[in-house]
């Protein structure tokens, strides 16, 4: 029983929403990381930038409408957090700034982000509720299960919306095709009748 539970916890641990990335930022460029996030989700992140004298890196977190959710200049190491208001694609950008007179070199940037369930402090919850370690793991497992179910529900809803949009688009294309065909037939009929009258007027045909 315990082994089965540990296997389940391991599987759900692989599904955790903790994302870590490391990259090199070229001088005087910016790199943005984008991800779709559900509405009303807490997003927490931790970053660290290699120190290069005279070079500056700023970061900014925003949505597709350009609303700034978190921002800081001259970063080296720190944390940030924001809450998504609506379902949208949110991006975190790191911007390198090097003075014109200085020869810049690439800087290493590491970023770890958590969202939703993984932002909870289960150790603190366990201490406050006086839960055993196994009970804390079960609580984490329950929250992860609920989160995955909600994500699947949202995905299903989006799929239905996309299918409805696709069906409406197909109906409009079909209507436009029929309308275009009718217009072409009408134009062809008018042209035949016009040419017939023209040739009769010129006495080219009876």
From Swiss-Prot:
Chief site of localization: membrane
Membrane-related topology note: Single-pass type I membrane protein
Localization terms from the record: Membrane
MF term (GO), any: cargo receptor activity
Hydrolase listed as a keyword: no
Entry-linked Pfam families: EMP24_GP25L (PF01105)
Side of membrane Cytoplasmic, spans: 194-206
Membrane-spanning residues: 173-193
SMART domains reported for this sequence: EMP24_GP25L
UniProt keyword Signal, yes or no: yes
Domain GOLD: residue ranges: 30-140
Signal peptide: 1-20
Gene Ontology biological process: dorsal/ventral pattern formation; endoplasmic reticulum to Golgi vesicle-mediated transport
Keywords carried by this UniProt record: Developmental protein, Membrane, Signal, Transmembrane, Transmembrane helix
InterPro entries: Emp24-like, GOLD_dom
GO cellular component, one term: membrane
Topological region Lumenal: 21-172
Lineage: superkingdom: Eukaryota
Purpose: Eca and bai are essential, though not redundant, for dorsoventral patterning of the embryo. Specifically required during early embryogenesis for the activity of maternal tkv, while the zygotic tkv is not affected.
Family indicated by similarity: Belongs to the EMP24/GP25L family.
Protein name: Transmembrane emp24 domain-containing protein bai
Organism: Drosophila grimshawi (Hawaiian fruit fly)
Primary gene name: bai
């Amino acid at each position: 029983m315990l082994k089965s539970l540990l296997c389940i916890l391991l599987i759900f641990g692989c599904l955790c929403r903790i994302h870590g990335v490391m990259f090199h930022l070229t001088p005087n460029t910016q790199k943005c990381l984008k991800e779709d996030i559900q509405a009303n989700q807490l997003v927490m992140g931790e970053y660290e930038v290699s120190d290069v004298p005279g070079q500056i890196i700023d970061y900014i977190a925003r949505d597709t409408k350009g609303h700034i959710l978190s921002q800081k200049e001259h970063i080296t190491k720190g944390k940030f957090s924001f809450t998504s208001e609506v379902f949208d694609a949110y991006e975190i950008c790191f911007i390198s700034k090097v003075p014109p007179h200085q020869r810049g070199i690439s800087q290493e940037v590491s970023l770890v982000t958590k969202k939703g369930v993984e932002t909870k402090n289960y150790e603190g919850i366990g201490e406050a509720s006086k839960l055993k370690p196994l009970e804390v793991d079960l609580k984490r497992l329950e929250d992860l299960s609920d989160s995955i179910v909600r994500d699947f529900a949202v995905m299903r809803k989006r799929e239905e919306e996309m299918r409805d949009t696709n069906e409406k688009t197909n109906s409009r294309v079909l209507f436009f095709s029929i309308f275009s065909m009718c217009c072409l037939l009408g134009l062809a009929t008018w042209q035949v009748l016009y040419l017939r009258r023209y040739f009769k007027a010129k006495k080219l045909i009876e």
